[in-house]
A protein has these predicted regions:
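Basic, Lys/Arg-enriched alpha-helical interface segments
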Residues: 1-66, 109-115
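A beta-hairpin/wing motif
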Residues: 69-70
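Enriched for short, Lys/Arg-rich terminal
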Residues: 73-77, 81-115
Length: 115
């Protein structure tokens, strides 16, 4: 039996990555920084294949009860769910740390793919 988990992104999380890249590359006009930021986020997300519960749970409901974890990466926070039975990690959303997350769409439906 392997100790690793499959790590996947929700459709919303993939959209978040595209928006992060677009903002940094097109609004701030630093495409190299945008690429580097996405690389750092993806690297940290890939590391969730081992001991994904090592990061803190969020402290608000209903997500705390659903065991939503938060992984800080630079100025961004990756929100993800762990299914120990299926040995999967689903990245639900990726937000800028200073963003008002109370008013964000937290649909955690379909998983697009695994890394």
């Amino acid at each position: 039996m392997t100790d690793s988990y499959k790590v996947g992104y929700s459709v919303d999380a993939l959209d978040d990555l595209r928006e992060i890249y677009s903002y940094i590359a097109n609004e701030l006009l630093v495409p190299e920084t945008a690429s580097a930021q996405l690389s750092r986020i993806r690297k940290e997300v890939r590391s969730l294949d081992f001991m994904p519960a090592r990061y803190a749970l969020v402290d608000w409901e209903p997500w705390h009860s659903m065991k939503m974890y938060q992984l800080p990466v630079d100025n961004f926070i990756v929100y993800y769910l762990v299914d120990d039975e299926k040995r999967t990690v689903t990245v639900v959303r990726i937000f800028y740390g200073g963003r008002d997350i109370d008013n964000m769409n937290w649909n955690h439906g379909k998983v697009e793919g695994y890394v």
